[in-house]
């Protein structure tokens, strides 16, 4: 098992979450209707993202004994890898305008890059970062090189 195909984000309000991500520029495909979606898939390159109602996602994990829905930092961050420091700034401003909360203003990082963090409407942490030496493949996915 050496790939990750889909990340599903449980959301408290799928309609509001959908609007938020549309404002960030994501193209989506809705199963159901716009006012009552069942699931929403992002039509992004690379690993796909989906939005699904949080309580329904917990039941999907275990219908008889769904996991508790927690608040706070889950130990997971999602990342958008930018191609310039200016793009980092632009993405963070766009996220904030769409309703995100900036958790860390963009700054030079201890690993030599530049980045910041925001939380989306459901509290998921998103890193927006840039590295001078980063290279991207034809799908705009970061190339991870062996050292």
PLM features: residue spans?
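Vicinal oxygen chelate
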Residues: 3-12, 40-41, 64-147
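Core segments of cupin and vicinal oxygen chelate
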Residues: 8-58
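Short secondary-structure boundary/hinge segments and terminal tails
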Residues: 38-40, 60, 113-114, 141
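A short, acidic/glycine-rich surface segment
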Residues: 35, 58-65, 135-138
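N-terminal beta-strand motif that seeds the catalytic metal site of vicinal oxygen chelate
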Residues: 1-19, 30, 75-80, 132-147
């Amino acid at each position: 098992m050496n790939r990750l195909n889909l990340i599903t984000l449980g959301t408290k309000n799928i309609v509001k979450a959908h609007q938020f991500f549309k404002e960030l520029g994501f193209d989506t495909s809705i199963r159901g209707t716009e006012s009552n979606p069942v699931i929403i898939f992002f039509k992004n390159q690379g690993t796909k993202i989906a939005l699904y109602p949080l309580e329904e996602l917990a039941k999907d994990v275990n219908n008889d004994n769904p996991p508790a829905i927690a608040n706070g930092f889950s130990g997971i961050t999602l990342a958008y890898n930018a191609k310039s420091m200016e793009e980092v700034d632009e993405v963070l401003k766009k996220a904030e305008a769409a309703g995100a909360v900036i958790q860390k203003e963009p700054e030079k990082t201890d690993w030599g890059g530049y980045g910041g963090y925001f939380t989306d409407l459901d509290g998921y942490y998103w890193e927006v970062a840039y590295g001078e030496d980063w290279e991207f493949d034809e799908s705009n996915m970061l190339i991870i090189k062996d050292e």
